[in-house]
Design a protein with these regions (language model features):
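A short, internal acetyl-CoA/4′-phosphopantetheine-binding micro-motif in the GNAT/acyltransferase core
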Residues: 79-90
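Active-site rim helix/loop that mediates acceptor-substrate recognition in acyltransferases
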Residues: 32-54, 58-59
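A short beta-loop-alpha structural element at the N-terminal edge
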Residues: 6-20
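Conserved acetyl-CoA-binding loop-helix of GNAT-fold acetyltransferases
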Residues: 90-107
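Conserved catalytic-core motifs of GNAT/GCN5-like acyltransferases
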Residues: 116-118, 127-136
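Conserved GNAT acetyl-CoA-binding A-motif
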Residues: 77, 105-118
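Conserved beta-strand in the GNAT
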Residues: 56, 61-71, 77-79
Length: 136
């Protein structure tokens, strides 16, 4: 666990899907990847089925930023996404979540990870990038 500006960063797996679902619903509707509430429901169900890894940044017990890592069928490549709620951008979450994504990718022997920052913000935008983690 890591602490960033009074937040706790935890690797959760899909055990925290309810926290993640609530976090996605708190995002600005325009920046929400799955769209409406039904889209969020479907996205969370897909995460459960895919064996995704969830990472949460909790502030006072509430998930305010997150990362999801979704491995492909080979479990050697993955797509990852970072979301941050309004009012929580300038706390270093994007850096910590990106580091956790890379740590988990290495731990799970995932060789290629493509990271997307899904929340729209003028103060923070991570470009899509591909990371090659050379696992031993």
């Amino acid at each position: 666990m890591a602490f960033v500006h009074a937040a706790e960063i935890r690797v959760l797996g899909t055990t925290a899907i309810e926290d993640y679902h609530a976090h996605l619903l708190r995002l600005d509707r325009a920046s929400r990847f799955p769209g409406d509430e039904r889209g969020v429901d479907a996205h969370c169900l897909n995460l459960l089925a895919s064996g995704a890894i969830l990472i949460g940044a909790y502030v006072k017990g509430v998930m305010r930023a997150s990362a999801e890592i979704v491995p492909d069928r080979t479990a050697r490549r993955a797509e990852a996404a970072i979301t941050i709620e309004d009012g929580f951008y300038d706390r270093g979450f994007e850096r910590e979540l990106t580091a956790k994504i890379l740590d988990e990718a290495r731990r799970c022997h995932i060789n290629d990870v493509r990271v997307h920052e899904l929340s729209t913000s003028r103060s923070y935008k991570v470009p899509t990038f591909e990371v090659h983690t050379h696992s031993a």
